[in-house]
């Protein structure tokens, strides 16, 4: 959308008079509400969760795939399990899941190498010194030094703990169902459960990447519906990180560009004046944006600047090519108002990346001049 396009609609319309309705004061009776005892939320049972879900092609349910992902942190017995197993997933006996995965050949008990690899660097140094070996080097070098010892009997006695490792079958299952560990690690940020995702994947035959993108777009879009553009911008930045973690680099880059685009638009939360096209409302809106530019207007936050710089470096693009790429991403985004044209936005972002202060100063002056011209025309 062009700069100030919204001004072309009914900019000479007058606001309808507002009728004031008298309100009669009613007596207020003060009552003290009873204080309810704090109740712990009821936990959902595992059976209720699995009724919502569908198993993988191999027959594993999402909570079993999650255990497959976390299995290398556990021993064959005497484990302590995290609280989320019961609170989030309704699993009362995580050890039973480990035992079943072992029986089915998804995991196996590790050998000495995995046992030593779980030791801290401090403990490794102590062992090396105990056997008269050099404690220098990186952790992997210290582990290899211990494993190269001819007599492993003493080492076996000092490191009796064993861990699980995934078999080839287990690695294949986890690779095919990567959505489970992904959603587990993002469970506080993405409103999609492993149970619901499993049903969409296996019943609706949808790719998880598509499901994830639809979920993130819906969550961010709710802010646009309420004209909270700053919150939408924050959601886009969060989605950039979430999509990067999912390996969806192109979709992530679009979210980063959209974040910067909204940063440069000058739009904030609760921009309801954009819905009222009366001259008075338009004047108030433009005056507020003029004050915004006259103050300390931050173009983009440091995190966005750093991410844009990294994106350009990783793509090994010249400034000219990166500018073209930015314009392509801006082209699909519609804004109700812009302080800068798309070309100016691209120039500003390149200036920010390279710590150029002259270009932003010039373009800020141009934007202020445009605002003043529009205000004079009202």
Give residue spans per PLM region:
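Basic helix-extension-helix modules of the SAP/HeH family
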Residues: 4-6, 34-187, 367-378
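Extended amphipathic alpha-helical coiled-coil/heptad-repeat regions
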Residues: 187-366, 370
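Short, flexible helical or helix-coil boundary motifs
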Residues: 11-14, 105, 123, 131, ...
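N-terminal intrinsically disordered, low-complexity tails
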Residues: 9-37
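Residue-level detector of solvent-exposed, low-hydrophobicity positions
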Residues: 10-14, 68, 170-171, 185, ...
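Flexible coil/linker segments and helix-coil junctions enriched in charged and small residues
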Residues: 8, 143-146, 276-283
């Amino acid at each position: 959308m062009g700069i100030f396009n919204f001004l072309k609609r009914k900019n000479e319309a007058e606001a309808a008079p507002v009728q004031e309705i008298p309100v009669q004061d009613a007596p207020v009776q003060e009552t003290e509400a009873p204080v309810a005892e704090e109740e712990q939320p009821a936990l959902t049972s595992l059976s209720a969760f699995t009724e919502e879900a569908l198993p993988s092609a191999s027959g594993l349910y999402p909570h079993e795939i999650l255990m497959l992902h976390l299995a290398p942190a556990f021993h064959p017995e005497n484990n302590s399990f995290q609280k989320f197993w019961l609170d989030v997933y309704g699993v009362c006996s995580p050890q039973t899941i480990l035992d079943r995965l072992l029986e089915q050949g998804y995991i196996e008990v590790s050998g000495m190498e995995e046992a030593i690899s779980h030791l801290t660097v401090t403990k490794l140094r102590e062992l090396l010194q105990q056997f008269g070996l050099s404690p220098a080097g990186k952790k992997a070098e210290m582990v290899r030094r211990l494993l190269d010892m001819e007599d492993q009997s003493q080492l076996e006695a000092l490191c009796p703990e064993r861990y699980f490792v995934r078999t080839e079958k287990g690695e294949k299952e986890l690779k095919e169902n990567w959505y489970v560990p992904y959603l587990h690690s993002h469970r506080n940020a993405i409103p999609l459960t492993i149970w619901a995702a499993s049903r969409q994947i296996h019943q609706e035959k949808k790719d998880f990447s598509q499901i994830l993108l639809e979920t993130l777009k819906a969550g961010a879009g709710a802010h646009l519906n309420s004209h909270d553009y700053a919150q939408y911008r924050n959601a886009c930045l969060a989605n950039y990180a979430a999509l990067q973690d999912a390996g969806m680099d192109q979709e992530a880059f679009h979210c980063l560009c959209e974040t910067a685009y909204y940063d440069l638009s000058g739009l904030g939360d609760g921009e309801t004046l954009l819905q009222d096209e009366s001259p008075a409302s338009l004047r108030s809106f433009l005056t507020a944006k003029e004050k915004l530019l006259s103050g300390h207007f931050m173009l983009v936050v440091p995190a966005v600047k750093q991410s844009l710089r990294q994106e350009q470096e990783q793509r090994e693009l010249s400034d000219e090519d990166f500018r073209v790429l930015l314009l392509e991403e801006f082209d699909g985004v519609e804004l109700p108002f812009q302080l800068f044209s798309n070309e100016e936005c691209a120039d500003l972002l390149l200036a920010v990346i390279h710590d150029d202060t002259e270009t932003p100063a010039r373009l800020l002056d141009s934007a202020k001049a445009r605002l003043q011209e529009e205000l004079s025309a009202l």
